[in-house]
Structures are given as structure tokens and as C-alpha cells.
């Protein structure tokens, strides 16, 4: 192995912009039944209402937090050491894994332009004939520390939050999901055992904080990062990781296709508190020089084991792109738009053979269960434009993904299923309905969908519309789209804009489903707005810094943050100020009426 550059990731590259606590937030930890279960949350302390509004205390709000230790001022951050190995003791206690001989080593002949991670741990794998998946544990009736961690995280101090809701909580329509059920460790276990949720935690990624993906839980979002052959570096991608989780990415997919894929992934995994997904076919193709015809099952198998040893938590596998389905795409306007799907279609044609990922699927399962890597069954034939939505090719593949889901479950492997794509609004619900029927309620994970094709540069908006809808119908995780979609590799600002758009979509979906704690944040912000508690409004926002900046563009003085108006209406035309005056007058009239009545008596 020939290393040609110095360490690219000094700690100082993570600026305060990336690591400082979010405005108005405090990192807190809630301890579970054992001292090493410490669940992070972001607490927003609220100011009291003024005397005019009752003078009451406003209780703090605990919010779901994905940022890891990076926003904890007490934490020491050193990218070269990686994050604390949060789950290492839990994995050891189960005594069902062994230290494995390193399966993959970078060949001496390969020129590496970035150094390996300096303290990479030895990989572990399952003991012979043992499955070490959360699905296996759940089916055995075992509630793991990971499951308890998830239950506390999803519950979000729900009892306190719901009790303090000021307004009426809307019931919502969950389309058959169980969103009102209290989230207990036993509920988490049962959902995983039924295959309706996954807890993606590779035994070789002990740094990850357990989270869950399923339609009976909070709607999650994924952010894609990764180097390309033309731009970006390991340093930039690690910074994108930290930036993405700061704003709320629940998982990360490393879609690197350039040089140093192995090293890039190692740096990301060792510094990621959220699950990391990949598409192994990209690296497999790099190994054969980019020649699709040279791909083989053996190359893919070795690549999958390499990534499992590093700690990848879930992998996209395009095993549903069958040879017989390829002609169904011939009449499409944009053909096959999935990179992985197009690679496998080309391989099938070149070899006049069936997709090796399909024919070797049970062998894939045996690898996955030895590390607890979850399947993200790829929709290689997803529609790439509105014209191709809901066509025969898309739904033929979906039926195969349903078959593969049940095969994976038989091997105790966790599964979620990927979905489109580009779909007009009136066709979105059919996608959710067909997936639930074909895939036995396995979690659905969709890219958008984009609801129109006319807005390059704004596809984070066109897709967030579809994401909110399909999230309401039951999609468990939404893959973000950035403004750079179809145009280029996203930078930090693009990542931020994509995540905020998708946090809005996910939260809107949770509100529509009637998630018990979802409305609490809306009510708290609305109350702060009506009472002109400007700082609380900023702090409760998805993007506090932007809310503050936009307010201060026209009213920058500190006194303006106590004013009962904004620059939109000014002091004379503020509807909320006038509404309060109406309320005060009505209260006085009622009081006067009561007094007069008493006097008459």
C-alpha cells in the first residue's frame, strides 16, 4: 500500500460552525435501566409568559437529537480517535461474536492517496451458525439495551410533553399505523420481531447510537454524502457527515465512487453516531476498473464482507432487477435511472444471465446475519421522471423485492425496501399500498418522491412535497434530495437545505399521522409567537440561526426582540397584537357583566 499524502483530517477542520450547540439548545442525557444507557436529547428551555399572558412558566421541551457528541460542549472531539464505543460492552455481553481474521487488506499494488484510519478496531463476526441480528434477538423475546435505548429516544418524555399541550391535539389519520401506542422496550422488540421495523446496528459499528426505522415510529430522514471521481475529499465528506447530523439526518449513506473508497468509509464510520449505509456495487465496480462486464459474484461478495467488517449498518442491493424485466424499460422516457440498477441490467445483458445478486441472495443473507447488516432492497427500476411513474417495470421489481424480504426474514436478517423516485401526487398512495401488500409491512424507504420534473435547482422542494405525502401514508424513512439533484455534488449549504426540507416533510407526516408528541413543538412555537417571545420562537425553529437572521435583517436591535410586532405588519397592524386586545376587551366585558349581575342580586 503506497500512501502519498499526510493525514487529511486534523481536528481543527471541524469548525465551531459545525460543532457548536444549536442556538438556545442544551444537550441532555436520559439514563435507562443501566448506567451505560444514556440517551441524548436536545432540550429547549423556554422563557416565562409575561404578566399580560398569565405570567406562567413554560416548561422546557425535549427534542430528538441526532448530532452525537459533536454538540456536547463537555465532549472531547478527535477525529483520529473516533467516537466512544457506546455499544461495545453490550455486544461483548451477548458472547455470540468472535474476533475475526481481517478478511480485507488493501493490496500493496494499490496507490492510496489518503492514510488509513490510525486506530481501526479488529473486526468481529458471529460465532459459527449463529445470527447476531436484532431481529434474531427480538424473535427470541430478548429486549436488548439497543431496544431500550430506542424506546427512550422515541418516547421523548412524551407523558410530560403531551400533558402540557395547550391546544387541542389533532387525532390525525395514521392509515392503520400504531402511532398512538406508548413506546416501551417491549413494543420496540415486538415491532422488530414482526419485521415492521429495523434497528440498523452492525456489531462493527459500536460507535452508533441506536435508532429505529418503522412506520409506527417517528419518520426518519437519510442524507447522502460521498466522494466522486471528479470532486470532494475525505475531509469534506467527514465534515458533511457532522454537518448533516447537526441538522437532523437520522442515517447517512456513503455513496463514494472516487478514489480511496475504503479509507473514506473508515473515517466516516469511526466518526458517525448514526447508522451508515452504502451501495456495495459501486466499490465492486471500482475494483474491476469500471468495466461492468468484469463484475462477478465473487467480487461483490468480497466487497460486502469488507464493508461489513468495517461496520456498515445497511446496504442497498439491487437484487430485484431481473433479466426479464429489462425489456419493460424500453418504452420509458428516461430508461433506468438508478446507478446500481443500470449496472446490473448491463451485466445481465452482457452475460445473458440472471442477476447474480438474485441468484446468490441466500448467500448474501448468510453474510449479513453474521454482522447484523440490514438489507435496503434497492429499487433499481424506479421511475426517473413523471412520465414513467407506476409502470410495469417498477411494480414487477417490487413484487420480487417482496419475495426477497421474506427470504431475508427466514435468515433472521433485517430488511427495509426502497421506493421511488418521480411520482405525481395522485399516484403516490398506490406506491405505499402496493409496498405494504407485497413486502409484508417491511419499512419503506423512498427517495422523495419528486412530484414534478420542471424545477432543477429546487428539487429539494419538489421532492419534499411528495415526501410529506408518502411519509403520511406510512413510509418509514425519507431519503433527502438537495438543490443540486441532477446538477452536481452537494456542498455544505446544499446538504443543509436538503435536510431542512426533509425535516419539514417528516414532521408534517408525523403531525398528519397523529403522533402524540409531534404537535407539542408546533404548539410551543405558536404560543411563543402569540406572546411575542421572539427568542423562544427562534430556539424552537428547525433552523434557529436562519430564523434569527431573517428577523434581524430589518429589526436588528435587542429591544426589537421584546417588541409586540415584526417588520411585516409593524406596531399598528399586527393581527396577533390586535387579537390579544380583542381577547382582553372580551374578558373585561365578561367581568363587568358578572359584576353588574351580582350587584342586581
From Swiss-Prot:
<feature type="binding site">
    <location>
        <position position="486"/>
    </location>
    <ligand>
        <name>Zn(2+)</name>
    </ligand>
</feature>
<dbReference type="GO" id="GO:0016830">
    <property type="term" value="F:carbon-carbon lyase activity"/>
</dbReference>
<comment type="function">
    <text>Catalyzes the synthesis of the hydroxymethylpyrimidine phosphate (HMP-P) moiety of thiamine from aminoimidazole ribotide (AIR) in a radical S-adenosyl-L-methionine (SAM)-dependent reaction.</text>
</comment>
<feature type="binding site">
    <location>
        <position position="574"/>
    </location>
    <ligand>
        <name>[4Fe-4S] cluster</name>
    </ligand>
</feature>
<feature type="binding site">
    <location>
        <begin position="379"/>
        <end position="382"/>
    </location>
    <ligand>
        <name>substrate</name>
    </ligand>
</feature>
<dbReference type="Pfam" id="PF13667">
    <property type="entry name" value="ThiC-associated"/>
</dbReference>
<keyword id="KW-0456">Lyase</keyword>
<dbReference type="GO" id="GO:0008270">
    <property type="term" value="F:zinc ion binding"/>
</dbReference>
<feature type="binding site">
    <location>
        <position position="566"/>
    </location>
    <ligand>
        <name>[4Fe-4S] cluster</name>
    </ligand>
</feature>
<keyword id="KW-0949">S-adenosyl-L-methionine</keyword>
<keyword id="KW-0004">4Fe-4S</keyword>
<feature type="binding site">
    <location>
        <position position="418"/>
    </location>
    <ligand>
        <name>substrate</name>
    </ligand>
</feature>
<feature type="binding site">
    <location>
        <position position="445"/>
    </location>
    <ligand>
        <name>substrate</name>
    </ligand>
</feature>
<dbReference type="Pfam" id="PF01964">
    <property type="entry name" value="ThiC_Rad_SAM"/>
</dbReference>
<feature type="binding site">
    <location>
        <position position="422"/>
    </location>
    <ligand>
        <name>Zn(2+)</name>
    </ligand>
</feature>
<keyword id="KW-0862">Zinc</keyword>
<comment type="pathway">
    <text>Cofactor biosynthesis; thiamine diphosphate biosynthesis.</text>
</comment>
<comment type="subunit">
    <text>Homodimer.</text>
</comment>
<dbReference type="InterPro" id="IPR038521">
    <property type="entry name" value="ThiC/Bza_core_dom"/>
</dbReference>
<feature type="binding site">
    <location>
        <position position="253"/>
    </location>
    <ligand>
        <name>substrate</name>
    </ligand>
</feature>
<keyword id="KW-0411">Iron-sulfur</keyword>
<dbReference type="GO" id="GO:0009229">
    <property type="term" value="P:thiamine diphosphate biosynthetic process"/>
</dbReference>
<dbReference type="GO" id="GO:0051539">
    <property type="term" value="F:4 iron, 4 sulfur cluster binding"/>
</dbReference>
<dbReference type="InterPro" id="IPR002817">
    <property type="entry name" value="ThiC/BzaA/B"/>
</dbReference>
<feature type="binding site">
    <location>
        <position position="569"/>
    </location>
    <ligand>
        <name>[4Fe-4S] cluster</name>
    </ligand>
</feature>
<protein>
    <recommendedName>
        <fullName>Phosphomethylpyrimidine synthase</fullName>
        <ecNumber>4.1.99.17</ecNumber>
    </recommendedName>
</protein>
<dbReference type="InterPro" id="IPR037509">
    <property type="entry name" value="ThiC"/>
</dbReference>
<feature type="binding site">
    <location>
        <begin position="338"/>
        <end position="340"/>
    </location>
    <ligand>
        <name>substrate</name>
    </ligand>
</feature>
<keyword id="KW-0784">Thiamine biosynthesis</keyword>
<feature type="binding site">
    <location>
        <position position="224"/>
    </location>
    <ligand>
        <name>substrate</name>
    </ligand>
</feature>
<keyword id="KW-0479">Metal-binding</keyword>
<dbReference type="InterPro" id="IPR025747">
    <property type="entry name" value="ThiC-associated_dom"/>
</dbReference>
<feature type="binding site">
    <location>
        <position position="318"/>
    </location>
    <ligand>
        <name>substrate</name>
    </ligand>
</feature>
<keyword id="KW-0408">Iron</keyword>
<feature type="binding site">
    <location>
        <position position="282"/>
    </location>
    <ligand>
        <name>substrate</name>
    </ligand>
</feature>
<dbReference type="GO" id="GO:0005829">
    <property type="term" value="C:cytosol"/>
</dbReference>
<comment type="similarity">
    <text>Belongs to the ThiC family.</text>
</comment>
<dbReference type="GO" id="GO:0009228">
    <property type="term" value="P:thiamine biosynthetic process"/>
</dbReference>
Amino acid at each position: 500500500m503506497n500512501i502519498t499524502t499526510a493525514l487529511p483530517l486534523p481536528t481543527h477542520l471541524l469548525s465551531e460552525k459545525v460543532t457548536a450547540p444549536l442556538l438556545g439548545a442544551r444537550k441532555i442525557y436520559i439514563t435507562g435501566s443501566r448506567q451505560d444507557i444514556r440517551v441524548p436529547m436536545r432540550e429547549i428551555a423556554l422563557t416565562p409568559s409575561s404578566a399580560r399572558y398569565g405570567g406562567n412558566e413554560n416548561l422546557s421541551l425535549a427534542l430528538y437529537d441526532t448530532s452525537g457528541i459533536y454538540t456536547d460542549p463537555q465532549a472531547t472531539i478527535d477525529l483520529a480517535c473516533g467516537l466512544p464505543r457506546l455499544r461495545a460492552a453490550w455486544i461483548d455481553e451477548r458472547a455470540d461474536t468472535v474476533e475475526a481474521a481481517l478478511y480485507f487488506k488493501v493490496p500493496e499494488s494499490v496507490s492510496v492517496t489518503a492514510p488509513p484510519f490510525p486506530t481501526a478496531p479488529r473486526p468481529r463476526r458471529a460465532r459459527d451458525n449463529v445470527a447476531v441480528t436484532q431481529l434474531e434477538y427480538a424473535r427470541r423475546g430478548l429486549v436488548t439495551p439497543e431496544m431500550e435505548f430506542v424506546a427512550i429516544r422515541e418516547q421523548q418524555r412524551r407523558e410530560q410533553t403531551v400533558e402540557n399541550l395547550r391546544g387541542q391535539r389533532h387525532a390525525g389519520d395514521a392509515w392503520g399505523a400504531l402511532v398512538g401506542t406508548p413506546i416501551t422496550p417491549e413494543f420496540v422488540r415486538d415491532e422488530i420481531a414482526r419485521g415492521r421495523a429495523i434497528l440498523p446496528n452492525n456489531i462493527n459499528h459500536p460507535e452508533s447510537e441506536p435508532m429505529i426505522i418503522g412506520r409506527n415510529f417517528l419518520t426518519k430522514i437519510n442524507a447522502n454524502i460521498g466522494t466522486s471521481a471528479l470532486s470532494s475529499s475525505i475531509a469534506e465528506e467527514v465534515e458533511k457527515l457532522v454537518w448533516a447530523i447537526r441538522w437532523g439526518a437520522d442515517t447517512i449513506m456513503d455513496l463514494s465512487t472516487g478514489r480511496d473508497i475504503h479509507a473514506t468509509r473508515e473515517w466516516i464510520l469511526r466518526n458517525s453516531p448514526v447508522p451508515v449505509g452504502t451501495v456495495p456495487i459501486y466499490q465492486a465496480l471500482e475494483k474491476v476498473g469500471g468495466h461492468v462486464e468484469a463484475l462477478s459474484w465473487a467480487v461483490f461478495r468480497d466487497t460486502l464482507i469488507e464493508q461489513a467488517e468495517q461496520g456498515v449498518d445497511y446496504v442497498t442491493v439491487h437484487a430485484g432487477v431481473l433479466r426479464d424485466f429489462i425489456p419493460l424499460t424500453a418504452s420509458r422516457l428516461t430508461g433506468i435511472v438508478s446507478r446500481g440498477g443500470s449496472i446490473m441490467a448491463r451485466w445481465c445483458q452482457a452475460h445473458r444471465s440472471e442477476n447474480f445478486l438474485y441468484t446468490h441472495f441466500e448467500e448474501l443473507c448468510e453474510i449479513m446475519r453474521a454482522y447484523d447488516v440490514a438489507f435496503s432492497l434497492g429499487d433499481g427500476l424506479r421511475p426517473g421522471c413523471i412520465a414513467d411513474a407506476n409502470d410495469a417495470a417498477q411494480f414487477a421489481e417490487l413484487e420480487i423485492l417482496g419475495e426477497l424480504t421474506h427470504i431475508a426474514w427466514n435468515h433472521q436478517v433485517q430488511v427495509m425496501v426502497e421506493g421511488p423516485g418521480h411520482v405525481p401526487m395522485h399516484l403516490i398512495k398506490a406506491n405505499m399500498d402496493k409496498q405494504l401488500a407485497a413486502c409484508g409491512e417491511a419499512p419503506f424507504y423512498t427517495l422523495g418522491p419528486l412530484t414534478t420534473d420542471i424545477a432543477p435547482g429546487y428539487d429539494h422542494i419538489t421532492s419534499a412535497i411528495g415526501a410529506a405525502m408518502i411519509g403520511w401514508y406510512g413510509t418509514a424513512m425519507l431519503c433527502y434530495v438537495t438543490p443540486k439533484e441532477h446538477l452536481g455534488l452537494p456542498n455544505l449549504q446544499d446538504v443543509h437545505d436538503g435536510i431542512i426540507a426533509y425535516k419539514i416533510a417528516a414532521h408534517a407526516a408525523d403531525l398528519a399521522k397523529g403522533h402524540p408528541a409531534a404537535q407539542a413543538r408546533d404548539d410551543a412555537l405558536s404560543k411563543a409567537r402569540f406572546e411575542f417571545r421572539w427568542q423562544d420562537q427562534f430556539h424552537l425553529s428547525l433552523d434557529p440561526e436562519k430564523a434569527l437572521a431573517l428577523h434581524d435583517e430589518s429589526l436588528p436591535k435587542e429591544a426589537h426582540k421584546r417588541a409586540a410586532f415584526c417588520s411585516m405588519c409593524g406596531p399598528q397592524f399586527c393581527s396577533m397584537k390586535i387579537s390579544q386586545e380583542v381577547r382582553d376587551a372580551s374578558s373585561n366585558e365578561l367581568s363587568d357583566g358578572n359584576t353588574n349581575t351580582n350587584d342586581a342580586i
